[in-house]
Regions:
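Key DNA-contact positions within bacterial/archaeal DNA-binding proteins
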Residues: 35
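HTH-adjacent hinge/linker in prokaryotic transcriptional regulators
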Residues: 42-63
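Extreme N-terminal segment that seeds HTH/winged-HTH DNA-binding domains in transcriptional regulators
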Residues: 1-29
């Protein structure tokens, strides 16, 4: 899985989640470290995705 596919997978998890998703859970899902997930979330935000970090995990805000 390349970086673009990984970010697409992260978005898929967030879009399907009813509750916040932790960075560790996202890391396990896509097979990378939590730090890579943090970097990917930053890139996704820079691309205009409204992802919010809460104390329970990441949430994709509805448009």
């Amino acid at each position: 899985m390349d970086a673009r596919e990984r970010r697409r997978a992260i978005m898929g998890v967030l879009e399907g989640a009813k509750d916040p998703v932790s960075g560790s859970a996202l890391a396990r899902e896509v097979g990378v470290s939590r730090q890579i997930v943090v970097q990917d979330i930053a890139l996704l935000r820079a691309d205009g995705h409204d992802i919010v970090a809460t104390n329970r995990g990441y949430v994709l805000q509805e448009a």
